[in-house]
């Protein structure tokens, strides 16, 4: 499948910013099942994008620009060719042993409720993969996708108590439960092509990966109740959202920030343009 991405992020400031520094994790890598045909990042300021790799092997671009800055736009356009690998990740850069991904974070800590939920799925019997699929299926059923009650700093505990959230929250709850069971798990950010023909989206997508004996890393998209397919584009991974956030940074000044995000994910059968 050929998938085209157009992702535009616009920062507007009521009071112009004096300076901005940002790190972007917006560039995919090639690995089995994913080939980047072309990819471009543009920033509408006088700055240079410095490419690096972070500790998790993600491609990053860092830039700084001096003000006054009234608006700042980061735009991504790209084309990626994908094939279905049944959710199994092969050929990705692995800088750490799987055990590192047992490390908890504030966003992925498990409380008594998440621990009990995880133990109930394990008690159903079966191997690690069966337990993870039970967790995937039941989280998809028991939590409701709802963008209103949560935000970027919502923890797994908070989202699970609400039984609501966005893809980031589903991923954090899945990770918290898996780690409680002693299964290494990590957060993945990327894009998802909806099967219903929806191309205009308000943000990118997120899911989890867990390390399974004899298979390695396997993806679990709890928000959609499936393992990643050729409809998924994998961008960055880490212990939680903070390690894989598309854009993170800081600014001096720039009070009254307003953020607008437009994402278009479509098969490369027709021209895609963010209006």
Regions found by a protein language model. Give the residues of each.
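Hydrophobic/aromatic-rich core segments of domains that either
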Residues: 20, 169-255
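Linear, non-domain "peripheral" regions
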Residues: 1-119
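Structural beta-strand/beta-sheet cores of well-ordered domains, especially the beta-sheet scaffolds
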Residues: 1, 7, 22, 39, ...
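Secondary-structure boundary elements
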Residues: 80-84, 90, 96-165, 173, ...
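Short capping/connector residues at structural and topological boundaries
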Residues: 18, 31, 70, 106-107, ...
């Amino acid at each position: 499948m050929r998938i085209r991405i157009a992702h535009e992020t616009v920062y507007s400031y009521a009071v112009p910013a004096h300076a901005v520094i940002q790190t972007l994790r917006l560039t995919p890598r090639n690995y089995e099942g994913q080939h980047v045909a072309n990819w471009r990042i543009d920033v509408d300021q006088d700055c240079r994008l410095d490419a690096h790799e972070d500790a998790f092997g993600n491609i990053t671009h860092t830039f700084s620009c001096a003000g006054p800055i009234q608006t700042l736009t980061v735009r991504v356009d790209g084309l990626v060719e994908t094939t279905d690998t049944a959710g199994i990740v092969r050929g990705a850069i692995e800088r750490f042993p799987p055990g590192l991904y047992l490390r908890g974070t504030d966003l992925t800590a498990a409380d008594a409720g998440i621990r009990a939920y995880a133990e109930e799925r394990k008690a159903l019997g079966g191997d690690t993969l069966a337990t993870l699929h039970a967790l995937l299926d039941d989280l998809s059923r028991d939590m409701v996708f709802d963008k209103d009650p949560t935000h970027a700093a919502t923890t797994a505990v908070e989202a699970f108590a609400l039984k609501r959230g966005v893809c980031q929250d589903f991923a954090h709850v899945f990770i918290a439960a898996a780690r409680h069971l002693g299964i290494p798990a990590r957060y993945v950010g990327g894009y998802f092509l909806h099967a219903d023909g929806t191309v205009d989206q308000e943000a990118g997508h997120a899911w989890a990966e867990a390390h399974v004996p004899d298979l390695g890393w396997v993806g679990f998209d709890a928000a959609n109740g499936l393992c990643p397919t050729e409809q998924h584009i994998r961008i960055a991974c880490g212990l939680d959202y903070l390690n894989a956030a598309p854009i993170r940074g800081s600014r001096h000044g720039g009070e009254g920030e307003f953020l607008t995000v437009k994402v278009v994910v479509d098969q490369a059968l027709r021209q895609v343009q963010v209006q």
